[in-house]
Amino acid sequence: EQGYPVRALTRSTEKVQRLFDNRVEAVVGDIRQPETLPPAMTGVGYLICATGTTAFPSQRWEIELPEGSGGLAGVIGWGRILTDATYRQQHSRNNPHIVDALGVANLVAAAPADLKRFVFISSVGIQRQKQFPFSALNAFGVLEAKQQGEQAIQQSGLPYTIIRPGRLIDGPYTSYDLNTLIQAKTQGKRGVAIGQGDTLAGDASRIDVAAACVACLQNPAAENQIFELVNQGSRPAELDWNRLFASLN
């Protein structure tokens, strides 16, 4: 809608076609495999990183227990996944550390040197990892991993914007969580609040987060900024992103 040609880095072209109905160019790659990234970076001026995995062990972690780990052995294996951090890292290929820390660092390293903006979707709670409920969310290190991803971006020398949304709601419903099951929506009734210092909490519409990503691409007030985004208050007829970004320090 804003006139940007879009290239989607994906492990599944079918998924991209299903979500975007062939309106974007799909390039196969995997941030966990840095050798797959350079072909996707040719001619890229702006990069939006919206990758992630589940905060808690799930099928999306691609857990691989030792061969023959059925029955009681499987139960023991899952017990170790839940309680032994080293074992967990060794036997899961898509956990937060691999995706949100190492994967983001791989993407940073592959980004063109003349990139105009690197936008990263992180999470509220990065600076509140020891406070409930973020301590529970971070039980398996997702906030630590996202923080490491943020640091890789900040230390890269690339111009960046880091957005820390609240709990994501609205479609597309691709996550395996309670919100997906109930398909919660803002239904356009709540406004957008942004803040700094990791003080905000609440829900954030995926639609509004996506709009913020696009709005900040060429906005100088959002360059090299980190901010939280949640939905709260009454919603104006039209969101004024210039006004919102102007409040950033």
Task: Mark where each language-model region is.
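NAD(P)H-binding glycine-rich loop region in Rossmannoid oxidoreductase-like domains
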Residues: 8-112
